Amino acid sequence: MNCLLPTLAATLLSVFLAPVAAAADFGAPMPDGEAVDIAAAASGATARTGEPALYRGRITEVCRKQGCWVVLESDGHSARVMAKDHGFSVPEDASGEAIAYGALEVEPVSPEHARHLVEDDGASAPAAQELRIVATSIRIL
């Protein structure tokens, strides 16, 4: 019993003092502010078009070729986050919640671009029109 107590105490202490995974930033410095949920952005997309803002969602897809885009999803709505001018990339195994900073656009998806996304990047077949965020930075939480 005397040996068990120190072992138990050490185990509990290591669990509580284990480092918490820090957020990872990619691209330009992330500005401070409140992020708009992707579902909320989708419902008012035309009102938000063109103005840089923070957008939040869960990563559901990542470009498998270069990590140059991710898809963020929230409550059944999604937006493809594209790295502006290919200015940054994210790890191909990125997952979890993320915040992107960039300009929201509602963009038609050409057949050529759809083919590129599916064949080269491993994406799901996109709709004829998609919500897109041209981002200067992304933070994976």
Residue positions per predicted region:
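Positively charged n-region of N-terminal signal peptides that target proteins for export
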Residues: 1-6
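OB-fold and OB-like single-stranded nucleic-acid-recognition modules
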Residues: 21-141
